[in-house]
Amino acid sequence: MLCGVPQGSVLGPLLFIIYINDIVNCSNLDAVLFADDAALVLHHKTFKQLQKQLNVEATKLNKWFITNKLTLNLKKTKVMVFHKRRNKKHIVKKFRLNINRVNIEQVNHIKYLGVILDNKLNWQKHIDYISTKLNRTAGIIFKLRKQVPSKVLLLIYNSLGSSYLRYALMAWGTVRNTALRKLQTLQNKIIRYMTHSPLMTNVTQIKKRSRL
C-alpha cells in the first residue's frame, strides 16, 4: 500500500486513531469520533449565526484534512439541523454549507453508528428500521419453527431481532408508548412462533412457562 491503513490489520485501527486524534482541536466544533466515523456538532441561538459559523468551522476542518494529506468524503458528508420550531421549511430552503466549493446535502434523517437520527428526534425512522428487522426475523422463525428446536429459534431471535431492540436503547427508548407498543407486538408474535403457541396466547404466561 502507498497510503491508508490496511483493512483487517491488528495495528491499523490504533494507528489511524492516533493519526486523526487532533482533529478535535482544529475547530470549535464538538466532535464525536468512532473509528473513521465522525459527527461534528455546533449550536447557536440564531439560525443565521449558526450557518455562518458552521461554514467557517467547515473551512478549518477542510484545511486540517489537506494538511494531514487526507480526503474528506463529501458524498458521505451530510448536514442536519435540529430545531425547536415546528415549521422548518425556511431552514430547508435557506441553509447552505459549502466545503471546498461543494454544497453539502441537508437531510432530515441519517444513520450514524447503527442508529437513525431524525431532525425532530422522535425516533420514528429508527422504530421503522427496527420493525423491519423484527418482521424479517419473524418470517425466518416462522419458516423454521417446525424444523428446529425452540433453543435454536431463541438463538436466531437473539442474533437477528433482539440485538436491534437492545442496541442504543438508552437513546431511542424514550419514544412514545405507541411506538413501543408497535415493537412489543412484533416481539410477542416472534415469542409465540418460537414456542409454537396460538396467536392469542398470553405472552406473559409463555415467558414464565418457557423461562424467556
Predicted regions and their residues:
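Short linear motifs embedded in intrinsically disordered, charge-biased segments
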Residues: 178-212
